Amino acid sequence: MDKSKRTFLKSKRSFRKRLPPIQSGDRIDYKNMSLISRFISEQGKILSRRVNRLTLKQQRLITIAIKQARILSLLPFLNNEKQFERTESTTRTPSLRARKR
């Protein structure tokens, strides 16, 4: 009986508590671009609470600050920079269609 119970026990893993993304001294403000830019994706979207690991109140304040910065044109609404450029056209040619048949 003891051996069968032992096989189902999981070993306790040690885990490190992550630091909160916003420290107590950080001020959430639309002018604080270094803080705001951490919570925006590469496309310029506001990241979710799950991704940011923020509390509801912090996420609300970050969202308001980002929107104010966008309105005052400190932040772009969209990030239109193309990171990947196509070198060849991807249109289908008749020769490719003939090969597949």
Curated annotation (Swiss-Prot):
Keywords on record = Chloroplast, Plastid, Ribonucleoprotein, Ribosomal protein, RNA-binding, rRNA-binding
The disulfide bonds in this chain are none
- Keyword Plastid: yes or no? yes
Instruction: Fetch the Gene3D superfamilies from UniProt.
Output: Ribosomal protein S18 (4.10.640.10)
User: Superkingdom of the source?
Assistant: Eukaryota
Q: Which molecular function terms from Gene Ontology are attached?
A: rRNA binding; structural constituent of ribosome
Q: Name the GO terms of the biological process aspect.
A: translation
Give the principal location in a single coarse category.
Answer: plastid
Q: What GO cellular component term, any one, is given?
A: ribosome
Q: Give the multimer and partner information.
A: Part of the 30S ribosomal subunit.
Family per similarity comment: Belongs to the bacterial ribosomal protein bS18 family.
Which named protein is this? Small ribosomal subunit protein bS18c
Source organism per UniProt: Helianthus annuus (Common sunflower)
